[in-house]
Amino acid sequence: MSFKAIVATCKDNGIGINNELPWKKIDEDMKLFSKLTKGNGNNSIIMGKNTFLSIGRLLPDRFNIIISKSLNENNYKDSITPEMKILDSIETCIDFCKEKQFSENFVIGGESIYRQFLNLNIIDSIFETKIYEKYNCDTFFPSVPYKYRLDKIRHIRKNPTCILLKW
């Protein structure tokens, strides 16, 4: 079973402010995110409550897993679909992913969810879009642990300068 992290960061590893992206949407990054997380159609995306609320909808063609102690499926009776599950812990999420045998599982945020998965040492690789601008942020991606080595670099946009790092 494979777990990967996918994230866009600015200088200082910022990823958000007030539960929103601190930068205007970058089409190239959004397309890359969609392509990677959809994969062969049997992938999951894993997010915390605030990331789910900031997106405001389920992302299609992927199984959406929301980790939250305060949300539960009773809150979303009208919008629960076969492609969505609300779970109360990282451990429950890992067990669920094992049971469902998704091809790939992408951790998509936020800060606490990234940190917990990285601390468990089960993230195989990290796809990081690095935006070479500084933005005000109140949420940050943890420093990439030393066990990861930079594997690939790909330029994806010029203004602002964005590159894809694969760790």
Regions found by a protein language model. Give the residues of each.
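Enzymes that bind and transform nitrogen-containing heteroaromatic metabolites
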Residues: 1-167
